[in-house]
């Protein structure tokens, strides 16, 4: 079994991700979104009945993928015998033949030709606007429904103005086939109130609202309501 006990919001996300093929999740900093999505990918990879299951975590840079996600993958597979890690390629090979790759969005041409049974796109607003519609979405097409299992894409991140992540957030709010969720620090209880007060007192208001209150309006040039 995976040594992971989800928090309440993480359990909500797992339930939603199990139902919806597409999901956009906006979370405050340190909410646990990366831990949740990696464990979701890991669970699905271990349980998949497809031949050669392939799951992916895509970050804006190689360094971010390694720094943010690699150690978590090792931590949560520590009790699973037969796992093999390729440090150079940031690849986890599971004993059932499934594979989880950590990928970088720095050169999208290197991603062309892959197939994916499930992918997390972390901070897509820091990547090319074409990387999902032209590269990732086609990779989800041919194996959807194989052995009764859907392929899926999960977008996670923190707001950074009106970029492509903001566009996907608005799409998810309007499209019933998409799941959309926002978790603000003032609502989740993940970070103690005392720590939030300390952060608010030491950060510019826009920065605090963006990082902890999930504001897409903070630090947007020309925004009418920037606070």
Regions found by a protein language model. Give the residues of each.
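Conserved P-loop
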Residues: 20-89
């Amino acid at each position: 079994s995976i040594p992971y006990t989800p928090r309440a919001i993480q359990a909500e996300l797992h339930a939603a991700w199990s139902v919806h093929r597409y999901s956009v999740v906006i979370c405050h900093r340190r909410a646990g979104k990366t831990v949740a999505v990696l464990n979701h990918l890991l669970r699905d990879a271990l349980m998949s009945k497809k031949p050669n299951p392939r799951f992916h975590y895509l970050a804006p840079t190689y360094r971010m993928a390694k720094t943010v996600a690699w150690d978590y993958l090792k931590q949560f597979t520590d009790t699973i015998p037969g796992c093999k890690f390729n440090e150079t390629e940031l690849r986890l090979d599971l004993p059932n033949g499934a594979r989880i790759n950590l990928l970088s969005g720095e050169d999208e041409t290197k991603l062309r030709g892959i197939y994916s049974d499930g992918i997390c796109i972390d901070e897509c607003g820091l990547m090319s606007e074409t990387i999902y519609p032209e590269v990732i979405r086609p990779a989800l097409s041919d194996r959807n429904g194989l052995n009764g299992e859907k392929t899926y894409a999960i977008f996670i991140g923190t707001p950074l103005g009106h970029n492509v992540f903001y566009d996907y957030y608005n799409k998810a709010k309007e499209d019933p086939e998409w799941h959309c969720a926002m978790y603000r620090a003032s609502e989740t209880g993940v970070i103690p109130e005392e720590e939030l007060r300390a952060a608010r007192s030491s950060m510019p208001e826009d920065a605090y609202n963006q990082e902890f209150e999930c504001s897409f309006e903070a630090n947007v040039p020309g925004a009418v309501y920037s606070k």
